[in-house]
Amino acid sequence: LHPATFYPVVQGHEYSGVVMAVGSEVTVCKPGDHITARPQLVCGKCNPCKRGQYNVCEHLRVQAFQADGAAQDFFVVDDDRVAKLPEGMSLDYGAMIEPSAVGAHASNRTDVKGKNVVVSGAGTIGNLIAQFCIARGAKNVLITDVSDLRLAKARECGIKHTLNITKKTLKEAAQELFGEEGYQVGFEVAGVEVSIRSLMETIEKGSDIVVVAVFAKDP
């Protein structure tokens, strides 16, 4: 159980749905519209919120962690968190907007073009980060995990280089793939100490490590 999650709680923070009813002053959507919404709940009153830095709200809550999520028949969403889906986009694709936004933002935190990249953690977010790095022109992208299933899914998504770290070390795999050039960008998406330590020990000096995961325990 993740210590940042308040139980009992309804799961579901990556979602889309159909609007059933709206308040009298709502103009961003109407009944029947297909929408998605940001899962972050902010106070709007603290200093970070007043500066527009809602991601570091002093009272930040996230659906499915500190507030109930979308895995229920009906739930209420504030209109300032809503985004209408483009015409013809399926609800399945709509539910991928939030994790895709995380992947796009993370991959844009440092310049990956022409560089060798390691993504530690092949879950949904890690998979998407690797795809965005490829799209942004990374030279080579290696994604690692302990799950062969996740790594197989990564290959299905076009990520050629995968590593199960229970079968070979990152140091060995990086040497084989990148040679003396090594790698210059690492993304920590697993949220465990051994993952970030492995990146720190194997990445080229003077390079960038982007920490994306929320750690259950301090590394």
PLM regions with names:
Residues T110-K113, R136, A152-P219:
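Glycine-rich cofactor phosphate-binding loops and adjacent beta1-alpha1 units
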